[in-house]
């Protein structure tokens, strides 16, 4: 039986628990190194080194996603720990369901430091039937139906974690007022990211 680690809130096996402290509150995630080892190593190393401290969520689209991780706050910046953009790590076990922690990119194999958290509350009915027909696993289609998500990003953006606590904070961030280019009018910042060993 295939394991879909995003469908439970326990920290199992190699999974890593982290708390993202923001000026809107905390969000707790579990990271999935078995699914996306290189991506998780990149994120955890950046977090431990304070790379994300003080960095904003520079792009917020309510009922879609909130994006951060760019020290320049332009959407053009950020880099990986590897010194160059690194490859996508797609999996048949991880999907862009509501609360997924996923890598932003500028096309295939262009991962750096930017990430987004999926915040779409409802997947249209017509899309759900397409998922079932398109080979998405039944438990994942069910999760999309019950909690929402962005299935069209599956196999296009690397999913490497899942929100397990702090939905209110995510919704609060998503509901902020934005200006041009979906940039919040008032900075929403990551104060720090704590790895819970």
UniProtKB/Swiss-Prot annotation:
It holds the Pfam family Pro_isomerase. It comes from the Bacteria. One of its GO terms (biological process) is protein folding. Its EC number is 5.2.1.8. Keywords: Isomerase, Rotamase. It catalyses: [protein]-peptidylproline (omega=180) = [protein]-peptidylproline (omega=0). The keyword Transit peptide does not apply. Residues 14-195 form the PPIase cyclophilin-type domain. One of its GO terms (molecular function) is peptidyl-prolyl cis-trans isomerase activity. InterPro entries: Cyclophilin-like_dom_sf (IPR029000), Cyclophilin-type_PPIase (IPR024936), Cyclophilin-type_PPIase_CS (IPR020892), Cyclophilin-type_PPIase_dom (IPR002130), Cyclophilin_A-like (IPR044666). Belongs to the cyclophilin-type PPIase family. PPIases accelerate the folding of proteins. It catalyzes the cis-trans isomerization of proline imidic peptide bonds in oligopeptides. PANTHER family: PEPTIDYL-PROLYL CIS-TRANS ISOMERASE-RELATED (PTHR45625), PEPTIDYLPROLYL ISOMERASE DOMAIN AND WD REPEAT-CONTAINING PROTEIN 1 (PTHR45625:SF4). This is Putative peptidyl-prolyl cis-trans isomerase. It comes from Staphylococcus saprophyticus subsp. saprophyticus (strain ATCC 15305 / DSM 20229 / NCIMB 8711 / NCTC 7292 / S-41).
């Amino acid at each position: 039986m295939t394991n879909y680690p995003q469908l439970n809130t326990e920290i199992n096996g190699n999974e890593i628990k982290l708390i993202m402290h923001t000026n809107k509150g905390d969000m707790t995630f579990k990271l999935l190194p078995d699914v996306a080892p290189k991506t998780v190593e990149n994120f955890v190393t950046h977090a431990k080194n304070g790379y994300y401290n003080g960095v904003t969520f520079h792009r917020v689209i309510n009922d879609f996603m909130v994006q951060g991780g760019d020290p320049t706050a332009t959407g053009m910046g950020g880099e990986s720990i590897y010194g160059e953009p690194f490859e996508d790590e797609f999996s048949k076990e991880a999907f862009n369901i509501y609360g997924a922690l996923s890598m932003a990119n500028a096309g295939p194999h262009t991962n750096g430091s930017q990430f987004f958290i999926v915040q779409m509350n409802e997947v249209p009915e017509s899309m759900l039937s397409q998922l079932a027909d398109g080979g998405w696993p039944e438990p994942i289609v069910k999760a999309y139906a019950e909690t929402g998500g962005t299935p069209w990003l599956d196999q296009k953006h690397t999913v490497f974690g899942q929100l397990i606590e702090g939905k209110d904070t995510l919704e609060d961030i998503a509901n902020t007022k934005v200006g041009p280019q979906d940039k919040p009018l008032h900075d929403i910042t990551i104060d720090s990211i704590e790895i819970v060993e």
